[in-house]
Design a protein with these regions (language model features):
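PAPS-dependent sulfotransferases, especially Golgi type II membrane carbohydrate sulfotransferases
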Residues: 1-8, 91, 152-155, 176-180, ...
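P-loop (Walker A) phosphate-binding loop of NTP-binding proteins
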Residues: 12
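ATP-binding Walker
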Residues: 15
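A conserved segment at the C-terminal end of the G1
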Residues: 18-30
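Active-site micro-motifs of SAM-dependent methyltransferase domains
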Residues: 26, 38, 146, 194-197, ...
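A generic secondary-structure signal for well-formed alpha-helical elements
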Residues: 27-34, 210-214
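PAPS-dependent sulfation machinery
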Residues: 32-116, 121
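PAPS-dependent sulfotransferase catalytic domain
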Residues: 86, 102-217
Length: 302
């Protein structure tokens, strides 16, 4: 029996999430829109909307969803007023309000099942599952060296190589944790290289996970040309030193790169320490927000 569980695509940026989104979008039952900035932003600022059992608070949330700066709602091609009215009339939870927007997108395309894609979701799996407890998570994984090289070649990545390496390793670690604690029906992994070289086999496996029939048109999608800028020798050395066991776990063989210079290892260690501290601060803030929640946040629609 086909499922209506929401689907979330996540992973390190430049891992192939956009390709997988296009593949799933080609399925006759699945609608996954271009990236928005709705879910994480709404969740992190949920305290600002107060008790959503109050109509005025639902109205404020609805107005932010359809017209807030930077939400990218306009990319969904929806009637903003109609969606806002549906949110105000809908169940009084944050997850429900968000789901109404994505359901409207799927409805516009004549499809019964919705999903969403954003790489950063991999660091916010707990938030996803609080909002959508029945969600199915699809983690797209790519050779970390290729991800870092690809990030270097993009115009929007301004955080440098150290942060690119840390972003990949933290995504892998978050996925490992999810795989250990979530049921196999809630989390799966897809490797970019297999999507490119043998898309039908990888997509058939994914459709089994999603409880969907395989649709041949999914495999007709092709990857965009990579933005790879290439790795300098010290960058490859650092990648392989840091990623080594994680690469091997997914069948990516390290080369015989030399040990990276101490200054590069030290700089990387400093950056990862700062990132861990920032993550702990976010966790403390989230705990305070949870304690102050006037009612559950989970969607009542799924």
């Amino acid at each position: 029996m086909a499922s209506d569980r929401p689907i979330f695509i996540l992973g390190c940026p430049r891992s192939g999430g956009t390709l997988l989104r296009r593949m799933l979008r080609a399925h006759p039952r699945i609608a996954i829109p271009p990236e928005t900035r709705l879910l994480l932003d709404a969740y992190e600022h949920r305290g600002a909307y107060g008790d959503l059992r109050r109509r005025a608070n639902r109205q404020a949330l609805a107005e932010w969803i359809v017209a807030g700066a930077g939400t990218r709602f306009d990319g969904l091609g929806l009637d903003a007023r109609a969606v806002a009215e549906e949110i105000v009339a809908g169940p009084p939870t944050l997850g429900s309000a968000l789901e109404i927007a994505w359901r409207a997108y799927a409805r516009r395309l004549g499809k019964p099942r919705w999903g969403d894609k954003r790489p950063g979701y991999v660091q916010h799996i707990d938030a996803l599952l609080r909002l959508f407890p029945d969600a199915q998570l699809v983690h797209v994984i790519r050779d970390g060296r290729a991800c870092v090289a690809d990030l270097k070649g993009t115009s929007w990545w301004r955080m440098g190589v150290y942060h690119a390496i840390a972003t990949w390793t933290q995504a892998i670690d978050a996925g490992t944790s999810a795989a250990e604690r979530l049921p196999s029906s809630a989390y799966t992994e897809v490797q970019y290289e297999r999507l490119v070289t043998d898309p039908e086999s990888e997509l058939r496996r994914l459709c089994t996970f999603l409880t969907e029939d395989y649709a041949p048109e999914m495999a007709s999608q092709r990857p965009e040309p990579p933005a790879e800028a290439g790795l300098e020798r010290w960058e490859r050395e650092l990648c392989e030193a840091v990623m080594n066991e994680r690469l091997r776990a997914y069948g990516y063989e390290p080369t015989e790169a030399a040990r990276p210079a101490t200054r590069h290892l030290a700089r990387y260690a400093t950056i990862t320490a700062h990132r861990r501290l920032a993550a702990r601060k976010r966790a403390v803030l989230d705990a305070h927000l949870r304690a102050a929640e006037p009612q559950p946040v989970a969607s009542c629609l799924s």
